[in-house]
């Protein structure tokens, strides 16, 4: 499909404590309804790409960490996830996760990246995550231009695998936006461009992925 060129959100406000506590968590608040105004299929890509891609997708390496192919996974935001919605205590990732793209379709990205879909991929044996390049907590889209298989390394503890360390970056950026130290647009663009640029500071401020309020 042809994905339209999108624009980053450009508003700059803070998140409340409730959003900070959500972090990368996927928990829901009981049966509470999601905030009104969410278009779970919203997709504003950071650059125009053709999907499925006509060429093979390849990760690149930055200081030993993997980055996605921008020609396949440029990152995308969901314009309906405004700051007001992200601040709403009833908003959790369940409000948008798997609504635009079901898990079976997300798994196609393994083939795009020439990666064998892992088996027993849960708990301590998890080696890959179908990652939202711009996290849902930062207003990322649940669409294929924002999803890539982030894998490895398998020889280290689960907490040290790439996708877990990126989770820490996501929580750190959410806190920075909440504290008014970074705009949401800058956080989105930064994590889509090179999530590793924030890793050292994120792991200092949010050890184990847990950021102090």
Give the residues covered by each predicted segment.
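Bacterial N-terminal signal peptides
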Residues: 4-14
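Nuclease and nuclease-like effector domains acting on nucleic acids or nucleotide cofactors
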Residues: 14-129, 137-213
């Amino acid at each position: 499909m042809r994905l339209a060129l999108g624009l980053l959100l450009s508003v700059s406000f803070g998140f409340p404590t409730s959003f900070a506590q959500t972090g990368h968590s996927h928990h829901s608040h009981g049966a509470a309804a999601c905030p009104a105004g969410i278009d779970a299929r919203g997709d504003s890509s950071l650059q125009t790409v053709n999907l499925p891609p006509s060429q093979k997708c390849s990760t690149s390496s930055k200081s030993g960490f993997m980055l996605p192919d921008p020609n396949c996974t440029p990152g995308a935001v969901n314009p309906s996830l405004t700051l007001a919605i992200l601040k709403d205590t009833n908003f959790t990732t369940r409000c948008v996760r798997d609504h635009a793209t079901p898990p079976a379709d997300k798994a196609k990205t393994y083939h795009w990246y020439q990666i064998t879909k892992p088996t027993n991929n849960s708990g301590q044996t998890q080696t890959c995550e179908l990652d939202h390049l711009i996290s849902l907590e930062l207003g990322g889209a649940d669409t294929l231009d924002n999803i890539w298989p982030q894998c490895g390394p398998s020889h280290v503890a689960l907490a040290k695998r790439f996708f877990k360390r990126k989770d820490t970056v996501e929580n750190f950026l959410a806190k920075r936006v909440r504290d008014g130290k970074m705009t949401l647009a800058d956080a989105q663009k930064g994590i889509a461009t090179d999530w590793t640029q924030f890793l050292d500071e994120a792991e200092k401020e949010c050890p184990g992925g847990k950021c102090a309020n």
